[in-house]
Amino acid sequence: LIDNYVDESVLLMLSKRQPGVTATIYTQRITSQLRLDLDRHKDQYPPVDVWTCKFSHDRFLIVDETDVYHIGASLKDLGKKMFAFSKLDIPATVITDLFFTTFAQSKVE
């Protein structure tokens, strides 16, 4: 998930994934509240890898390293207002290669 506005509600959504399914979040910054939410989350649920990356304005969801969705608003706002999920007809590597080869990022421990 690439989303600059992650909060506890997004972590809760990710906690519903099946055993063995990994989750990675790329977000702009880790606030003190998000740090607290991440610490609480990892005590109760399977881990979520979190990276900071300041080079994305839009939100994307990559599923199974193949399907790419462009999301019109932060997942934290799901159900609050109308916004679109659009499946993009591009390989996931178009997005992931930018993150791993072009843009610098830092893993959050």
Which ranges hold each PLM region?
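PLD/PLD-like phosphodiesterase catalytic module centered on the HKD motif
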Residues: 2-109
